[in-house]
Amino acid sequence: MSFLHIRKRHRQPLKIITVLFLILTVAGIWYVNHLYRSVFENNVRIPGYEIYLNQSISLQDLADSLEKDQALLDVGAFRRTLKLMKAGDAAVPAGHYKLKEEMSNREMINMFRSGTQAPVQVIVRKARLPEDLAEDIASQMSFSADTFLHLLGDTAFLDSLGLDRHTIMGIFLQDTYEMYWTLSPRDFILRMKKEYDRYWNEERREAAAKKDLTPMEVITLASIVEEETAKEDEKPVVAGLYLNRLRRGWRLQADPTVRFARGDFSSKRVYLRDLEAESEYNTYKIDGLPPGPICIPSKSSIEAVLHAAEHPYMYMCAKPDFSGYHNFARTAAQHERNRQAWIRALRK
């Protein structure tokens, strides 16, 4: 009996050791799995969440921002991964970052630490003045409007591009462009010049030459067409009219150029006193085209000039039905009748 009792007592520590081993094994597996999930599993609550950093910050500070906006499923897991990767004090460069769907903490940290930005879509819209363009572009980029505007007037920089203060607006083409948010103003303009040169391929240059126009002169005429009509089907007709006047050596007498010279775009009405304004943009006073575009025209207006309609019209006047379309005329007498009809409609 005593022998059996001794053997039973010896089994007790073995059971304890076995149980402890199992507990430690399970705990170890759980811990390793927990670490693995912290590092490698998806932790994005808001796919497409965007971060704009004007200056470099630490990953710890960025974690605070992500927590505040509830962008992550488990911010604690993100912080633990920072410790494991010894990246808490790492700097995140200024830039635009975007969280992708199914992104792990490790992927996010590597993205931030390496400064791998997500490009932004920048829209170049119609603008009349450099100030308007600068405000619009700066609202989509990291640089300031003042910095951009200063460069638009930098004579030495413009000279290096073969441009001047009149023609610089002509290289901006209405479109959407993909680029990095932190691009400098200088590189932005160089990108626009590259896009301009790409647009003016051999076919378009030949089409311009057939009309005795340079690419910039096409842009300038297109800007007048852009301001004259919003009707796409009417643009080639308007372009053809102004080309007719140029070929005959007539002054363009385009009201939009008078409004541009006046600097007041609040009203489309042009008064007799406006026609006498001394300005290199007033086509009632100057021969030929103004020295540069009066706005950033759409590509459809540019194409309307390159593929202008052939017709005998020399005059145009807004239709009295206020449809936005115009009546076209070959003679001054016909034009005067159209003009009187428009005046009567205004007085009603």
Feature locations, PLM:
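Bacterial extracytoplasmic/cell-wall-associated proteins, especially those involved in peptidoglycan
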Residues: 58, 123, 135, 141-146, ...
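Intrinsic structural disorder
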Residues: 1-17, 55, 67-68, 97, ...
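N-terminal type II signal-anchor transmembrane helix
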Residues: 3-47
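Signal peptide-directed extracytoplasmic domains
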Residues: 31-200
